[in-house]
Amino acid sequence: MKNLLKLLLLVLAVYLGLAVTVFNNPEVRQKCAAVDVIVKDSDVAGFITPLEIRTILKDSKLYPVGQKMSNINCAEIEKVLARNPFIDNITSYKTAGDHVYVTVTQRLPVMRIISDNGDNYYIDTRGKVMPHMHYSADLVVATGHISKQYAHSKLLPIGRLLKYDKFWDNQIEQINVDSAGNVELFPRIGDHVVYIGQPVRVTQKLKRLKAFYAQVLNQVGWNKYSRIDIEYDNQIICKK
């Protein structure tokens, strides 16, 4: 009889211990009620949407809603989303309540490449290739004889320069590369082509071009010349 009483007391103690554990740790019994998805930089990039994030998680059987909070693996969520070529960084965490937060930072393109060899892709701020997909943002387009190595070593610095300068970001809409690797710029304002030659000392060349715009074209008109050559230092050659 004493042994039975001891056994009952032991079972009761274990039960009470588990009950206290569950009570003090609501995650064990609580289920996820909502997933809050935040996609940063949506105003300047539109490669991925919150709906697409949710779809990826559902297809991977990782969608948290309805799952016990204790069973939700945020590290696995981040791992799966990191495979998407348009995502740069992911942070996922559980709240003290019943929500899961997923914050995604998109890769930001600086240029679209449409090469004569058939390549069609974007390059991001780090110079990494991004596959061509639906995207409507106003980016400079580079055309012509462009290999991936040329795009990374020569065009990426130009793309960054244009992207982070408000004037040039608004002014230049296309870059063309000829078979010798020489570069032409096509502006939005002005009926002319800007020839810069080999893509070296581009910062200095654009500085001279900007001064020429202000001091000359503002006086004679932006459609005065059909070609503006800024290849060589200390001179600008114009053709009507």
What residues fall within each predicted segment?
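Extracytoplasmic segments of membrane-associated envelope/inner-membrane machinery
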Residues: 103-179
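Flexible glycine-/small-residue-rich
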Residues: 39-41, 104-108, 134, 143-144, ...
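N-terminal membrane-targeting segments
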Residues: 1-67
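Short, well-structured beta-strand/strand-turn elements
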Residues: 82-98
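Short beta-strands and strand-coil junctions in structured, solvent-facing domains, enriched
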Residues: 44, 88-89, 99, 108-111, ...
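Extracytoplasmic/luminal low-complexity segments enriched in Pro/Gly and acidic/polar residues
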Residues: 196-240
